[in-house]
């Protein structure tokens, strides 16, 4: 009370003070109130002038003072009234632009000086006072669209304890619940505060909103706590809308932020709204959960890289949170969502059911644990309850979920966990016993639903089984099938259910259909276990004996016939029943009836196709003959008057099918006379004479003609059909034969075919096949209908075939367009029917395209059209991805001789070579590599040669040198332009070393003498081959000794001799070459010197000049000057790269005209870069040459400053800075001139304001992006360093911060250097501008990949947002780089007047190369360690009672974000970094001690709470072990013991992870290691010795051998990973060698069951040793015999690999067996790794004379053996 009295005076004093000011203040308030009322009352034009005058006179301040005074003297009525008046005033002031400024001033006055008045009103906790304050705050938020929100957040303390209390409803409100009247709720403190709070977070910027919601968790907790008890429906809807729109759909909020705000409490309270009587609220709650869990864009679901795997396929670890459901353990990434799903009761309403299924579909990892969770609700024994029906629907929908997309995309040799997969197929709730009970339940609906669940499970099993086959998981598939089989009822149960169903209700067809489907799937999935014994009288025999069958009965038969294949007894579908038809005929009846839908017709046709395929009934070359038969019968069904006579047809079919199945080869022999048409047609013709033709046989003739016509269209021989009709069917008139069955005059007969009495005419509207068959050719381009079945597509193929074979149809644009249009319709159809056999027509077109020499006449038109069709078929196969392998195989089989097509196979001698070339060229886009290379060997057209070479190059294929020789020989007399294009392509193959030798005796693979001689003979065939020859000399297999005997063969070829002389300059010591070179340089040097070089030879001027430049020292001064004079006089070549190179080599800038030439050349460069949109290759060459010239010592003094600055402006302000060669030139240009000459400030501004530079730094992510970023930043660094004082501005600093990534990359180091310089000149730190921190966890990495790179620093309106990535910190630990190059000093005092551009360029290049070798994928340690002290979540500022400021390290946060591990790892760094790390460790130790002491004190106070006591004890123990570890590290430093190797520090950083994972197998060992000693020992690598010794111990224990070995492999994996990632220095290598680790690793490789991943780790350890150890690990060669060890290992792998080229046969392997492909690729990968190691050791051996002697010179033989 005393404090209160001192602050406000006594009661009497306050009353007196109030009385004195009452009259004035009341008058002021009344005046304002009247003004506000007047403004609000006016409807049209509002007069704000009185209000403006009121505030201009200073009454605004008095108003606020009065308001504050009322609060002080506790005049509640006046205080409340004044608060409301302030609210109205602000609302009015916000309504007009003329008064907004006044309102802003009033708000700032309240926030800066009177926030305590706001607090006082809130603390009163009375609706009369508090509600007006909340409404005032709400108005401040709304003022001018949220203009003052940030000021409100800054000045107003939202951590006030009173704010959460405002959200606690009174007892009366809780008693009334949601049923209380809205008016009463509007007066509640909770309602008013929520309205203010929702308005605030809705209008706040995302960053402010995030801070409000995350920092004020007590407010949010109280808001959630009473949502379902006290809030009205309308308010609840508003709350949910804000949650959805402003939290979940806020794009800047990461998932961690959303889960931190909307936690389990929120989800549990919101779920109650599903049971609200307000439908709108229910919909809004459902919308919330759909967004919360099912939205791919906005949900809180973290990406899961396991799904059906127990551990991540990326790193073999599980990063999920452990949960236990019904005693089953899971590791999941979305624990919040799982706990949310547990709230749902999907069996109660469909809304919850639909939402739950969508969440499971979005987060498939939750399916397995949720399926187990369902078992906690009780068993699944059948009951006629709503719960049972609801849970059945839920289970069925779970089973129906698709295979997760992650699983579809994953490529892993490790199979998924069967326990997880089976829950997705058959959830545990569906136990075998419960299913049996359901199948035997007395109520049919229960039995049906049980069958439905099993059917869905079997369908899912089939899909997953196929998926396993695609992934190559064959062994795990067997385990999965066995597990599924044990969970479903036995077959006799289903048979019994089927029998009981028929006995109780014969008319019930639904349950028998379900059981038939089960039998069908069962027979497919478990063929060896499928065997059922049906009673003699069963539903299947009953249906087959019926005269008519319904659609559902057909479905039953369909399934029955399919599973009969696997049953012991086969159904004789071809035999007619007594007094009835055969099943074959019955199905034809059903398919061809008027009432049959397209789906039924297609399904029956497919079924009959399957039945007839195993018998010799139709020719296999036909496309769906049964569908053609059905289509003809459908035509008869349209003839209503003839239906009564159909029995004749059905009997005819019965006899035909019965006989053709029983004696098929009889009819095959009969067909010989008729070009081997189908046996079915032959039997049909045989039975024709027995058909009853009494009455009206015309309809039979009509059908017969239609059927035979259909058969011709799908591939039956039309000549054989014509002959058969004439011999066997005399009733068919010649007129009908000519119209319907003759193809010679097809186009003429179409009009007659379309007559009104034709069956075809009547079928056109219902059958696409008949429509396309009767369409005139001119209308084929305008088809709007699409094929819907195989017969329709076959009809299209036949019409195309007619166009091809019709000689009256010329090959023109119309033909091409029509063929493309029709083939395109087939391609669109094949999207849905991948098995359509388009490939069947290919051979026919190939036969047309390749007439045989001895037999067939050449028809050029037919050949050309057929080649085009082959190309279209290849395009369809390629685009649809189906039958491409078959396409290639057919072509190779026909075209090439022999069964196996090897490279350069010979053509089939039956065909003309020119025809084969033309044919293969037409389909070259779709041929295999072997076929293409064979084509290149024989083809003569250079255009196709160029295209094929380009295709092979783009696909990364290699070609043989013999192919190059062949192409050069064939191109000798072709068009020069074509030759040049082909030569450019060939040169690329040489430059990329994609040309291999055919045969070589040289162990290093060099070209032999005979091969070189032969190739030189090909080169001299044309002078234009100089491009290939130039690349040939740089080829890795080029051998100078093999070449020199043939050198004089190129003497007479000017370009070839010039190129040879220039390229082989280094071989001038060879006598023969020296003589050749002197003759060449003398001849062409004299010609140029005398200016006698003719214009006709000007095309080789540049090559001559390049040669002269190379040999410039061989000319005297006079001759050089003569050549220079000639060069300067050549206007056509003055600005060529060759000219620049010669002038640079001549290096005489005092020669008349050279300086002028230099200025003009620079002007030419500026003009070119300013005007051109595209840069040519020749200009890039010019830039490169100019860059070399500018490095010369004399050049800087000759440069014109204005020209240089204008050129820099032209480049730095344009898009050319994206070109690496341009950037390299600019760097040289900057380095070669005086610092004072460049306008650095302008250039810096130009570069930083260039959008292209921003794009380079932020967006570029291609293979050259790193070098491009470095060059552009180096330019900026150089320009900045010219005048750092002037360039050190806040704008430059802010722009650079957005480009900085905080890594050790070369460009980041340059940016950091600039930032340090700016800070030193401005004396302000950029860290003061940090507004917020973001920390991205592992789970959000997938989002980053989707939205692109997340910058370390981003600029927002509020300030800088700094984002750290946990994954990046982990990478920084794993790839910690110790040797990091420093930024070179380019402008120091020592070289201020020394403009040696060459030295600077060399320094820059060396810096980049060294940095790239060290790796860039890690944070800069110094930057990160200094930055973390500014993060409040890591280091908090704490004030004690006396006001002293201390800093507390939040250890748990350090641990969680991996920075603690990073600190330990950085102890191996330089002294500066290590000292900072030790300082951090000291502070962490101090903070841990204080926290432990505080927890002990709290533990004593709250010891009565046993649960808390136990958890606190665990936490104390948890912190204590880290304290011990930190003290060990600090003690080691204190004792100044031996330095600790980086490998040990890295191992300790990994120990930290084990200490925090109690379930990890190595946790206990890690714990013991920490407690084992008081210091860190320089030779003690954690865990290594234990694991090395534990193998033998485990082998001795036979009882636990299997279990322990599995644990051992886990421990081994940890140790190998630690060594692999941690070995960084030669000291690490020596330490491992002393401990015998390498010998142990070699022994491990011989372990028979060592996992592939562990084997790869061992190989990589040796790979790193070769590069880390100072001597490369030579002792491993001499002491451990590692070379011979790996060579034996390599030979073993070779023997297990296929002999063919693996890369060129991947497609074949993939189609044959995915498992075989995976095995082969794994072996190939292992072999590749071993060969790399052997090549490395070979280089080490050759570097030591002692080892060369020790190995007796066998190193080259090792390489030779590898190349065999």
Swiss-Prot record:
<protein>
    <recommendedName>
        <fullName>Nucleolar pre-ribosomal-associated protein 1</fullName>
    </recommendedName>
</protein>
<keyword id="KW-0698">rRNA processing</keyword>
<feature type="region of interest" description="Disordered">
    <location>
        <begin position="1"/>
        <end position="23"/>
    </location>
</feature>
<dbReference type="GO" id="GO:0042273">
    <property type="term" value="P:ribosomal large subunit biogenesis"/>
</dbReference>
<dbReference type="Pfam" id="PF16201">
    <property type="entry name" value="NopRA1"/>
</dbReference>
<keyword id="KW-0690">Ribosome biogenesis</keyword>
<dbReference type="InterPro" id="IPR021714">
    <property type="entry name" value="Npa1_N"/>
</dbReference>
<dbReference type="GO" id="GO:0005730">
    <property type="term" value="C:nucleolus"/>
</dbReference>
<comment type="subunit">
    <text>Associates with pre-60S ribosomal particles. Predominantly associated with the 27SA2 pre-rRNA. Can associate with a subset of box H/ACA and box C/D small nucleolar RNPs (snoRNPs) required for peptidyl transferase center modification and with small RNAs snR37 and snR42. Interacts with URB2. Together with DBP6, NOP8, URB2 and RSA3, forms an RNA-independent complex, which is required during early maturation of nascent 60S ribosomal subunits.</text>
</comment>
<dbReference type="Pfam" id="PF11707">
    <property type="entry name" value="Npa1"/>
</dbReference>
<dbReference type="GO" id="GO:0000463">
    <property type="term" value="P:maturation of LSU-rRNA from tricistronic rRNA transcript (SSU-rRNA, 5.8S rRNA, LSU-rRNA)"/>
</dbReference>
<dbReference type="GO" id="GO:0005634">
    <property type="term" value="C:nucleus"/>
</dbReference>
<feature type="compositionally biased region" description="Basic and acidic residues">
    <location>
        <begin position="9"/>
        <end position="23"/>
    </location>
</feature>
<dbReference type="InterPro" id="IPR039844">
    <property type="entry name" value="URB1"/>
</dbReference>
<dbReference type="InterPro" id="IPR032436">
    <property type="entry name" value="NopRA1_C"/>
</dbReference>
<comment type="function">
    <text>Required for 60S ribosomal subunit formation and pre-rRNA processing. Required for normal accumulation of 25S and 5.8S rRNAs.</text>
</comment>
<dbReference type="GO" id="GO:0003729">
    <property type="term" value="F:mRNA binding"/>
</dbReference>
<keyword id="KW-0539">Nucleus</keyword>
<dbReference type="GO" id="GO:0000466">
    <property type="term" value="P:maturation of 5.8S rRNA from tricistronic rRNA transcript (SSU-rRNA, 5.8S rRNA, LSU-rRNA)"/>
</dbReference>
